[in-house]
Curated annotation (Swiss-Prot):
Widely expressed. Residues 1-26 form the signal peptide. It comes from Mus musculus. Gene3D superfamilies: CD59. Residues 113-134 form a propeptide. Disulfide bonds join 29-53, 32-41, 46-74, 78-98, 99-104. It is a lipid-anchor; GPI-anchor. One of its GO terms (cellular component) is external side of plasma membrane. It is found in: Cell membrane. The lineage of its organism: Eukaryota, Metazoa, Chordata, Craniata, Vertebrata. One of its GO terms (biological process) is response to bacterium. This is Lymphocyte antigen 6A-2/6E-1. The gene is Ly6a. Pfam families: UPAR_LY6. Residues 27-119 form the UPAR/Ly6 domain.
């Protein structure tokens, strides 16, 4: 038997075994409940075999006061996206998203301040200009 063929077969079997072992460890999700957006959350191994990582961004409005919080968790299925509801005079706007990759349920950053975005834009434009001049 050809040695290179045997080596390739062994490598293929090892690769398949590693890929299966990685998925057998379970889906990793961030988990926290009712925390401010900027709060970092610890990760957990999802206990559900076909579970999903869930991000919920909620704006709770009482009178004219708004409080924004997030929930990151693992669930067996993706919950329906209920965008707006009212509970006992309290309005709640919820945006729900689901994903099935490790640590994919991170809340989307808000983009930072106007000066930060202007600096990034200026840097991008200057690097393009520099490349065209060189």
């Amino acid at each position: 038997m050809d040695t290179s063929h045997t080596t390739k077969s062994c490598l293929l079997i090892l690769l398949v075994a590693l890929l299966c072992a990685e998925r057998a460890q379970g889906l990793e999700c961030y988990q926290c409940y009712g925390v401010p957006f900027e709060t970092s959350c610890p990760s957990i191994t999802c206990p559900y075999p076909d579970g999903v990582c869930v991000t919920q961004e909620a704006a709770v409005i009482v009178d004219s006061q708004t409080r924004k919080v997030k929930n990151n968790l693992c669930l067996p299925i993706c919950p329906p996206n209920i965008e707006s509801m009212e509970i006992l005079g309290t309005k709640v706007n919820v945006k729900t998203s689901c994903c099935q990759e490790d640590l994919c349920n991170v809340a989307v950053p808000n983009g930072g301040s106007t000066w930060t975005m202007a600096g990034v834009l200026l840097f991008s434009l200057s690097s393009v200009l520099l490349q065209t001049l060189l």
